[in-house]
Amino acid sequence: MLKNSLKIALFFSFLFAPNARSALNIGVIAPLAGEYQKVGEELVSGVRTAVDEINSQGGLKGEKINLIMVDDQCDDRIAVSTAQMMAVNVSERDKMSLVIGPYCSNALQKIAGIYAKAGILQIIPTSVSTSIQNGNYKGLVKMV
C-alpha cells in the first residue's frame, strides 16, 4: 500500500514542482540508528524500491527522482533542523518536492508547519499522533 501511495504522491508532487528542476527531490526522514533503526531501514527500503521502479521506467514524465535520506534519530531537534534544511534554507532547484516522514511522532507537530509553509507535500507513513489531523496543514497526508 505504501508503494502505491508513494507513486500517487510522486505524481502530484510532479504536477506542482517548479519547472527549473531537472529532477524531483524526495526526502525520507527516518531513524537509521538507535532503538528504531530497523523500522527506519524498512521505511527507507520501501521508498527506495518504489523510486527505483519509477526511475527504471524513465521517471515521471522523464524526470528522475533523487532520494535524500536523513537520520533524525527520533530526535525532534534533528527533525526541525532537517525541515529547515529541506524546505527553507535551500535553492528552488534543491528544494524537496515531497518529504516522507518522520517516523517518530514527537517531531511531527514541530515540522508539519515548516513543510506546509514551503508548499512541500508531506506523507506521514507511521505516526499515530492525534495532535495533527490531515486537514490542519496543507499538503500533509497521514497514512495511519
Question: Which sequence ranges carry the predicted segments?
Answer:
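Signal peptide-proximal N-terminal region
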Residues: 44-67, 91-94
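Extracytoplasmic ligand/sensor domains, especially the bilobed periplasmic-binding protein
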Residues: 88, 93-144
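Extracytoplasmic "Venus flytrap"
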Residues: 27-48, 70-77, 103
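Short, well-structured alpha-helical segments in soluble
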Residues: 69, 76-97
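Extracytoplasmic/secreted envelope proteins and their assembly/folding machinery
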Residues: 44, 48-51, 79-84, 96, ...
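Sec/Tat signal peptide C-region and signal peptidase I cleavage site
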Residues: 18-22
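Sec-dependent signal peptide recognition
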Residues: 2-11
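Short beta-strand elements in bilobed, periplasmic/extracellular small-molecule ligand-binding domains
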Residues: 60-75, 136-140
